[in-house]
């Protein structure tokens, strides 16, 4: 018989956004005392795999009653191909998925049939899923955990101490044209001209730029 608890499926070690989509719920389950384990369904991802905080919960067995798939919705076909039908059978399957457009393509909607419900990270995503499927959809932003984080000063990154700072983060692997950092810079320059008296700064943080030097 399957155990009471939760299996989180996604990229537990992946140092990119979708990896956090699994890690934050995992840390919240740990704080709440809910039994859980994590399943790395695609360990050969090209993204860096150096976040080992959840290693002690890694498993290859779908032993719990509840599966939560913490992935981008575009990865649903790959998910089904790698895991097979048996992984979904006789379990309460939840998609905690990300999709940034107003509708899902039909080719992806067909892969929702194995799910019992969907969790959406934002109201926009919730509306999108409701337009795309009759499954129950719940708006559930990522949890905030009380884990201790390493603190850095502004001085370390040469950010003026008294400025109002805007932060934009993106991953080059997510396609620069889609993340559009140039538009962020233009919007900042438009809002705060060089003659402006406002003390403001724009900080852009990116990862994986070394793999996209032509961009």
Where are these regions (language model features)?
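Short hydrophobic/aromatic-enriched beta-strand-loop microsegments
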Residues: 136-142
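Short hydrophobic "strand-cap" motifs at the C-terminus of beta-strands
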Residues: 9-10, 96, 121, 140, ...
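Conserved catalytic-core segment of nucleotide-activated headgroup transferases in glycan assembly
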Residues: 20-28, 36, 146-215
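Extended catalytic core of nucleotide-activated donor transferases of GT-like folds
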Residues: 7-9, 27, 40-130, 134
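Short catalytic/ligand-binding loop motif for oxyanion handling, primarily in non-cytosolic enzymes
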Residues: 15-18, 37, 45-48, 75-78, ...
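N-terminal subdomain of nucleotide-sugar transferases
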Residues: 1-43, 64
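A structural signal for isolated positions on well-ordered beta-strands in alpha/beta enzyme cores
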Residues: 7, 37, 94, 117, ...
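Residue-level recognition of beta-strand->loop/alpha-helix junctions
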Residues: 38-42, 141, 204-206
């Amino acid at each position: 018989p399957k155990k009471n608890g939760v299996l989180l499926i996604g990229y537990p070690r992946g140092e990119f956004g979708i990896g956090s989509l699994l890690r934050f719920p995992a840390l919240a389950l740990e704080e709440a005392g809910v039994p859980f384990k994590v399943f790395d369904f695609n360990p050969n991802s090209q993204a860096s795999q150096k976040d080992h905080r959840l290693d002690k919960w890694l498993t290859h067995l779908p032993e719990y009653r509840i599966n939560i798939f913490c992935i981008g919705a575009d990865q649903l076909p790959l998910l089904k191909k790698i895991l097979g039908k048996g992984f979904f059978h006789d379990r309460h399957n939840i998609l905690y998925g990300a999709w940034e457009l107003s509708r899902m393509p039909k080719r992806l909607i067909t892969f929702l049939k194995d799910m019992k419900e969907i969790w959406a990270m934002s109201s926009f995503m919730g509306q999108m899923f409701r337009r795309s499927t009759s499954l129950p959809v719940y708006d559930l932003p990522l949890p905030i955990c009380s884990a201790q984080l390493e603190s850095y000063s502004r001085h370390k990154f040469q950010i003026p101490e008294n400025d109002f700072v805007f932060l934009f983060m993106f991953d080059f692997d997510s396609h620069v044209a889609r993340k559009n950092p140039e538009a962020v810079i233009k919007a900042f320059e438009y809002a705060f001209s060089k003659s402006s008296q406002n003390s403001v700064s724009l900080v852009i943080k990116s990862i994986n730029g070394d793999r996209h030097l032509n961009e």
